[in-house]
Regions:
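Cytosolic juxtamembrane amphipathic/interface segments immediately preceding
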Residues: 1-9, 42
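Glycine/serine-rich anion-binding loops at beta->alpha junctions
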Residues: 107-117, 159-161, 240-244, 334-348
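Short linear Ser/Thr-Pro motifs
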Residues: 22, 31-34, 249, 340, ...
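A juxtamembrane structural motif centered on a specific transmembrane helix
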Residues: 1-2, 319-366
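Transmembrane helix boundary and interhelical junction motifs in multipass membrane proteins
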Residues: 162-167, 244-249, 259-261, 330-332, ...
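Hydrophobic alpha-helical transmembrane segments of multi-pass inner membrane proteins, especially
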Residues: 15-23, 27, 31, 37-228, ...
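TM-adjacent membrane-interface loops and short helices in multi-pass inner/ER membrane proteins
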Residues: 214, 218-261, 265, 272-276
């Protein structure tokens, strides 16, 4: 295997895991969406074909990014931030979908700028934190500028509104600040100051705090606010050990809302059983483990921070999504990376994974 890795010059385990998740995701997107596609568009392949286009684009992006020196991305860090910011502002000029302004649309395709914002924040923070390492213990010249940038992007995403996306960006930024070694007292104080803002956002809309109450006692709200979660429980229970078979699940037949997006893991549980669930968890664990090892053995601070951020960008939503569909966390609206329907998420995650693979190549050049 090491000989094979040296020939490819990349971490073959990580590459295999990413490709396995992506292609299995296409299989499950078809399984979970064909009924919805027929009802909405009269074509069972509508969602599948759209995602397939993003998959091909993602594969092309992976090939290009894997052979593009990751150090050169540093010069594009500010540009990515500007483009992401412009996208987050531009969404408010497009029509809302289900009450939210989250997408840019053109010619039948749509793009979610908050997905790009996650990567932009990681790239910019990795570049800047590595360059300004000697100033990070100070509040005003160290932590404050990053908190200001983070607050601006998180605030825009919350206005869409997209609490899950805002939470992801915030956690990724804080994790990188912690990893870089900022003063923990200042970071903790900033976190404490952010709590009232989060509570206000939670209480500002009835459906948000109702979801929280329903999470605490889902069976009491099984007909309304916890309906989706209860249907997820039923999918897990119906799947048993081996599942009911690919395409044979019942919960996706308009019982489980968002079966092809936020709750695709529930359909995997029903159709592939607990063995399938554990296999998916194992592949994500492999991605996280390999990503962490790449970050630890990276050649410099910038590469290490970038690898850690990308690993968290993939691993954190995966863990949160699985916790949500199993009732361990309140509903957040986060998709499962590489598996859920969502071209923006797939495209950005594949591109970011390719950069992670490029960083891993340094280990095999020695």
């Amino acid at each position: 295997m090491k000989w094979f890795e040296r020939q490819l010059n990349f971490d073959i385990w990580l590459l295999g895991a990413v490709l396995a998740l992506s292609f299995f995701g296409m299989l499950m997107i078809y399984s979970t969406s064909f009924i919805l596609s027929v009802q909405a568009f009269g074509n069972p392949y509508h969602y599948f074909k759209h995602e397939l286009i993003y998959l091909f684009a993602g594969l092309l992006g992976m090939v290009a990014a894997m052979h593009f020196n990751n150090e050169r991305w540093r010069s594009f860090a500010s540009l990515f931030m500007v483009i992401a910011f412009a996208g987050l502002v531009a969404v408010f000029f497009f029509d809302a979908t289900r009450g939210a302004h989250r997408w840019l649309r053109h010619a039948g395709f749509q793009f979610q700028p908050s997905e790009l914002a996650k990567f932009a924040v990681i790239l910019y923070f990795a570049h800047s934190l590595a360059k300004r390492q000697d100033k990070l213990k100070s509040f005003w010249s160290g932590l404050a500028p990053y908190l200001g940038i983070l607050g601006m992007y998180v605030g825009l995403v919350m206005l869409e509104p997209d609490f899950g996306g805002a939470l992801s960006i915030g956690l990724l930024g804080v994790m990188l600040l912690f990893t870089a070694g900022v003063n923990l007292k200042y970071l903790a104080a900033a976190g404490g100051a952010a709590i009232p803002v989060g509570l206000y956002f939670l209480a500002s809309e009835e459906y948000r705090w109702r979801r929280l109450v329903a999470f605490l006692d889902p069976w009491q709200y099984s007909k309304d606010y916890a309906f989706q979660l209860i249907q997820s429980f039923l999918a897990f229970g119906n799947g048993g050990l081996l599942g009911v078979g690919l395409g044979m699940g019942h919960q996706k037949l308009f019982y489980l809302p968002d079966a092809h997006t936020d709750f695709i893991f529930s359909v995997i549980a029903e159709e592939w059983g607990w063995l399938g669930v554990m296999a998916v968890i194992a592949v994500y664990a492999l991605v996280i483990t390999r990503g962490a090892m790449i970050a630890i053995f990276a050649e410099n601070r910038y590469s290490s921070y970038l690898a850690m951020g990308i690993t968290a960008m993939i691993g954190l939503p995966a863990v949160i999504n699985m916790a949500v569909v199993t009732g361990l966390l309140p509903t957040k609206g986060l998709v499962l990376p590489f598996l859920s329907y969502g071209g923006s998420s797939l495209l950005i995650n594949m591109f970011a994974a390719a950069i992670l693979l490029n960083i891993s190549a340094k280990r095999f050049q020695a």
